[in-house]
Amino acid sequence: MACRHRGDSGRPLSWLSASWRSLLLFFPLVTSVNSIGVNQLVNTAFPGIVTCHENRMVVEFPRILGTKIQYTSVVDPLGLEMMNCTYVLDPENLTLKAPYEACTKRVRGHHQMTIRLIDDNAALRQEALMYHISCPVMGAEGPDQHSGSTICMKDFMSFTFNFFPGMADENVKREDSKQRMGWSLVVGDGERARTLTFQEAMTQGYNFLIENQKMNIQVSFHATGVTRYSQGNSHLYMVPLKLKHVSHGQSLILASQLICVADPVTCNATHVTLAIPEFPGKLKSVNLGSGNIAVSQLHKHGIEMETTNGLRLHFNQTLLKTNVSEKCLPHQLYLSSLKLTFHSQLEAVSMVIYPECLCESTVSLVSEELCTQDGFMDVKVHSHQTKPALNLDTLRVGDSSCQPTFKAPAQGLVQFRIPLNGCGTRHKFKNDKVIYENEIHALWADPPSAVSRDSEFRMTVRCSYSSSNMLINTNVESLPSPEASVKPGPLTLTLQTYPDNAYLQPYGDKEYPVVKYLRQPIYLEVRILNRTDPNIKLVLDDCWATSTEDPASLPQWNVVMDGCEYNLDNHRTTFHPVGSSVTYPNHHQRFDVKTFAFVSGAQGVSQLVYFHCSVFICNQLSPTFSLCSVTCHGPSRSRRATGTTEEEKMIVSLPGPILLLSDGSSLRDAVNSKGSRTNGYVAFKTMVAMVASAGIVATLGLISYLHKKRIMMLNH
């Protein structure tokens, strides 16, 4: 391909980064004569195609002008060559690409460029043609800062093309299809491209609106030609569009690359996260309404970016606004708009979304009267209980498929009879009460606007029994208990951590890593799971922490030794009595660990910590039971003698790590305000650094261990 550049060759080609979002439009004017003495060749219309982008135009010459293209140049209206104009002429492909800046003049809301073609076959090259070609100025007629961007709605994406006066003529606006035979829509790209008439397009997911010199195209996410990129629960939709019109030998093309993410954001106590799957594009900038923020500046503006397995943007909640809503208590968090600009296929493409955090539970029914004597919660739900009203057909209990026991659609009423031991009902003990809790959720009868993500209503139902309740003293006749199996099966142990010393509800496996700060105790419990024998007892041997999942990895921090508290840096491990709140107290061991125990010398906190314990199971009826007893008399204590072998000792580990942060962390207050369970974002943010740190620490520990072993061998 032969190329010719005009103007300052050091000037950057701004058209290379222009957006496909622009209107592609052809606007011909009559030709004029270059200078005195040059033969006039007057043409009423430029016979090629002009494509208008946001920052540049592309001129495609017809084959009949192929002999003249070698001597084509960009000139001003007087015929003088524009020396500052940097354009690229490609004689092989018969194209000319020129940026608006320095190559056009601004005339009544459009960019006007003049090109001159000289016939090299003419004597002394005295015959010339001049064409004035125009492109509309994108967004020039309105204050809309999102002009040239895809607008993402709940079920579709849209893009608006601008006209300049005179283009949206009556033939375009008429509904008569015969008047629009010159228009067609090309969807997709390359071999997958399909050409559709307007009527065909409107039956395949497209809609067209023309008003006030603008054309808006709405595209369903399932429309013909739309490509979907998926990763986990995130989805991105893309489709290249070309709106073509041919009339009187002139060609008009409106082209755009639409891009949209339609999934709701996820919110926690500190951040709002937007997930975008991998696709052929790279993030260029973010705009929250006050100007573009380059990727290199995101951290300074409270935005964190992850690029592993797609793209994740974490927005600090200080960037969000609050909205008082009838459906959200006390308020709803949202961003008024979020514009993301990507580099894709040598162009800049943008999309605008409107992120909102889903509402928290708006209604909580708490009454001891809900609990029945036969072990159920009876709950009535009315459609008018909220504004907007509920769609009672969508009511569900927890994560189960439990259905209402009574429906009265005319009265807008349903009734649930929720079993205390089914339908996902949870329970916990508090003082002398046992508390049962479940959740009913439904969709609104009148869904929110297309932009809103707030489509679900949640209601908590809770009841409790106290020691004075008659249910506790009721005698229930039942069949005789089956005889115990001779082989009880393998014994199962678990090591769990709790939010506080009440030991009511442990952290779930999906909540790891659990975030803790210096001076915060870590409440741990070792427990036997599948035994009901009151005569067996769980006895701790040693407990320790490591920086990896392997219990044998180095370095190690001891927290319990020989069943006794381990004093390290004046922060002693503390044991907690189990009490009578559990059925078999001897099947539990509870203690807490101070996070200062993991600060080593001048080093900082070992941020990811894994806990492990070795235990014995002793039979209190056995003559050797005294061998499993624990006697702690301070530093002079000796190791406990046991009658068991190492094979009978069992090791149990936490299901996940503890993430330790320093006191100065800016996330501490936000995490504490929501409880210790808000761990996901903070943990993920430091995970990459932790993997590297853990590897270094483990390697150094192994080298130290091998060095000591070698010295011992030499001494022997």
From Swiss-Prot:
PROSITE patterns assigned: ZP_1, ZP_2
Any single Pfam family the record assigns to this protein: Ig_ZP2
Domain ZP: 370-635
Extracellular-facing ranges: 36-686
Residues covered by region (Disordered): 467-489
Propeptide: 639-716
Cellular location(s): Cell membrane
GO MF annotations, alphabetized: acrosin binding; structural constituent of egg coat
One GO CC term on file: plasma membrane
Entry comment describing in which tissues the protein is expressed: Expressed in oocytes.
Keyword set includes Secreted: yes
Presence of the UniProt keyword Cytoplasm in the record: no
Broad class of where this protein is predominantly found: membrane
Keyword terms, alphabetized: Cell membrane, Cleavage on pair of basic residues, Disulfide bond, Extracellular matrix, Fertilization, Glycoprotein, Membrane, Receptor, Secreted, Signal, Transmembrane, Transmembrane helix
Swiss-Prot/TrEMBL GO biological process terms: binding of sperm to zona pellucida; prevention of polyspermy
UniProt membrane topology term: Single-pass type I membrane protein
Cytoplasmic face of the membrane: 707-716
Function statement: Component of the zona pellucida, an extracellular matrix surrounding oocytes which mediates sperm binding, induction of the acrosome reaction and prevents post-fertilization polyspermy. The zona pellucida is composed of 3 to 4 glycoproteins, ZP1, ZP2, ZP3, and ZP4. ZP2 may act as a secondary sperm receptor.
Description of its domains: The ZP domain is involved in the polymerization of the ZP proteins to form the zona pellucida.
Record's protein name: Zona pellucida sperm-binding protein 2
Native source species: Sus scrofa (Pig)
Gene: ZP2
